[in-house]
């Protein structure tokens, strides 16, 4: 493995900040970019306040995210909601970018058809987005076969009519900060279930779904992987592990599995929980797994609980980066000098969205707050697909 000191010597002489519009940073209503960091320090949603931030590590940002606040159906008279989506791409940005553009629209469509929000609406929206992306893969297969190996972990939260819907496919995570009045503390409560082969429960699920495949999960270099290839068991995309038609040339050999399969190896169906929001529920921390590699649930909740709301998502990311630097026995100031691509040796792309819950607003079906639509990453995220 290349040492931290060696990488610093490689990049220090030629390092420069990625170009951004304006001088040191850019600011507008949709957030601000400062080098590899994007942030929207504060804003209002229909049920309270929020803070968002993204740090890029990959050469192309693979994390995409969205916060929508307003009608959650195709009609302005429909229920008001706050929608949060965190999409952690792997193999490239295409799947995460696609989901960021289309999943919320599919949720609005099915909410309208259903005349309301439900777990079934969310599942339908995930599966419709999956089918749309697989259709895109099919169209581009001959000219861009690599797109069959691209996928995205998808975490969604919807606050609507006093309920919180959490849907997850992959290993991003949402943690609730809940006030324990008797002990005068704010306790971390994980609301999402994760789909990573490192978890025994996930390995057992895979074995039960594929009883005739002894290689469905393989321990490779001390890491459990599905078919020895990928750690997550659910995603949108990853067509090469969903449809046998993509498990062949011209896809690179490292992505092909030797056995013929007749049903999807990975799944796109999200695990969904519905939580009634109580006055003790203070805030939610949505984040891609890059944050949770460096901070525990309770550490993240303690930071949000004890620090000012303004810029709190950015503070969580900076705290995680300090931990990443410490693990590599280097200074945080030196880590900040490392450019994208090389930066991936030290940490992943990280997305954090902190959503504060105002108990006076949560249960309302209407709100006078302005409509809001913001995508995380700004100029870092590149063009939409």
Swiss-Prot record:
Membrane topology: Peripheral membrane protein
Any GO BP: negative regulation of defense response to bacterium
Outcome, altering residue 289 to N: Abolishes phosphatase activity
EC numbers, comma separated: 3.1.3.16
Signal peptide: none
Keywords: Cell membrane, Hydrolase, Magnesium, Manganese, Membrane, Metal-binding, Phosphoprotein, Protein phosphatase
Cofactor dependence: Mg(2+); Mn(2+)
Cellular compartments annotated: Cell membrane
Presence of keyword Cell membrane: yes
Sequence positions bearing Phosphoserine: 77
One family name in Pfam for this protein: PP2C
PPM-type phosphatase domain segment(s): 46-357
Keyword Membrane appears in the UniProt entry: yes
First-level EC class: hydrolase
Binding positions for Mn(2+) 2 per the UniProt entry: 88, 289, 348
InterPro entries: PP2C (IPR015655), PP2C_BS (IPR000222), PPM-type-like_dom_sf (IPR036457), PPM-type_phosphatase-like_dom (IPR001932)
Post-translational modification: Phosphorylation at Ser-77 induces dissociation of PP2C38 from BIK1.
CC cofactor note: Binds 2 magnesium or manganese ions per subunit.
Residues annotated for Mn(2+) 1 binding in this entry: 88-89
Family according to the record: Belongs to the PP2C family.
Designated name of the protein: Probable protein phosphatase 2C 38
